[in-house]
């Protein structure tokens, strides 16, 4: 096992070192961008690779050539699935017709979910009143959030990782952006990064095995 620090270049370096050590299969990566780099690299070795959490469709399928990455396997859903389902939930289940989106630009995961949410929400008849982006490493989102506030959305889709989501929710609260936020599986891990008040009426899409925690399920249904 090696730590690639969430970086695509470092992931390939770690993979090369492990190949020199004689590995015959690869479990990983965790997030989308380094996994995409490893998918391409492992194909050159014809090495089996499985990821439990990278959701970009391109991890297992090359749309440009319409070919499946035959050595790469995924044990989770995809960005299109998440983005589409959250748009369906927002429009059909929650009844929202005006949405805004805030996401990190240049990030495969964030952009993938945002694109699919926007396309599905609009196809259902909803209106995307604003799309705001930020750069990797940013910690101040108030400018984007203030712009969103001025567009008066009923809901905000925030397909980012939990560290940034915690900051975004806190800053949204501080400027009075009091609408529900929705997200993807990158929100999983928010405990300790956001308060219960900030997460009121918030929803996100994540992996869950039905029947794995019957006590909780029964208590929730009750």
Labelled PLM ranges:
Residues 8-24, 89, 139-153:
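Short, well-structured alpha-helical segments in soluble
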Residues 15-20, 40-44, 146-149, 173-174, ...:
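Mature extracellular/periplasmic domains of secretome proteins
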């Amino acid at each position: 096992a090696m730590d690639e620090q969430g970086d695509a270049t470092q992931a390939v370096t770690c993979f090369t070192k492990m190949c020199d050590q004689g590995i015959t299969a690869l479990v990983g990566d965790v997030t989308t961008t380094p996994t995409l780099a490893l998918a391409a690299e492992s194909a050159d070795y014809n090495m089996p690779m499985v990821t439990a959490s990278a959701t970009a469709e391109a991890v297992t399928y090359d749309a440009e050539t319409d070919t499946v990455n035959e050595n790469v396997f995924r044990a989770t859903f995809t960005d299109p699935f998440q983005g589409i389902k959250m748009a369906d939930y927002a429009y059909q289940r929650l009844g929202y017709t005006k949405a805004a989106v805030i996401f990190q630009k240049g990030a495969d995961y964030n952009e993938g979910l945002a694109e699919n949410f926007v396309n599905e929400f609009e196809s259902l008849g909803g209106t995307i009143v604003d799309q705001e982006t930020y750069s990797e490493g940013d910690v101040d989102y108030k400018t984007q959030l203030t712009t969103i506030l001025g567009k008066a959305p009923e809901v905000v889709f925030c397909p980012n990782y939990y560290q940034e989501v915690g900051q975004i929710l806190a800053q949204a609260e501080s400027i009075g952006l009091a609408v529900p936020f929705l997200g993807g599986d990158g929100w999983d891990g928010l405990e300790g990064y956001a308060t219960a008040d900030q997460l009121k009426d918030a929803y996100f899409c994540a992996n869950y095995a039905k029947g794995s925690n019957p006590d909780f399920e029964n208590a929730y249904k009750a």
